[in-house]
Amino acid sequence: MENRTEADPIITRVALPGDVPAMLACDTYAHIHACRGDTVRTAAGKGQCLLALHAGQVAGYVLLHHEFFEYGFVPLVVVSPAQQRRGVALRLLAAAGAACRTAKLFTSTNQSNLAAQRLFAGAGFVRSGHIEHLDEGDPELVYVIFLR
């Protein structure tokens, strides 16, 4: 699935295993946490990863699975530092919504991550609840968007 308009130079599509090195190259967290690479490789191998391309280069990626109480769930959205604040994350969340097989799509972030909270609100997600004790002193806020 490729998604692009004439006015928007960002292309979104399903990531392939061969895309993983370029995806990890744009992910600053992955540079210092090797386990991120394992997570991304596994997701790409299962077809659970979408990427955004700008001018042929990976601008970001999103993971999507359907194992959160059998609903779609986005556990990770990554945008290259050079592409941040340009709508890439919104495009990735929209692509995840289009690829989601369920009527609800969930995601989450730490209470301390104000940028992610603004992103999710801007993408149409609403607060659904929270989970304590994942990161002590920093509750995980759960969000949902109703797709159908």
Residue ranges and their predicted role:
Residues L76-Q84, T109-N110:
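A short, internal acetyl-CoA/4′-phosphopantetheine-binding micro-motif in the GNAT/acyltransferase core
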Residues A99-Q111:
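Conserved GNAT acetyl-CoA-binding A-motif
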Residues L114-R127, E132:
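Conserved N-terminal glycine/acidic-rich loop preference
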Residues T5-E6, I10, V14-L76, S80, ...:
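Acetyl-CoA-dependent GNAT
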Residues F106-T109, V126-V142:
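Conserved catalytic-core motifs of GNAT/GCN5-like acyltransferases
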Residues E70, A103, V126:
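Short acidic/polar active-site loop segments enriched in Thr and Asp
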Residues V79, R85-A98, R118-G122:
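Conserved acetyl-CoA-binding loop-helix of GNAT-fold acetyltransferases
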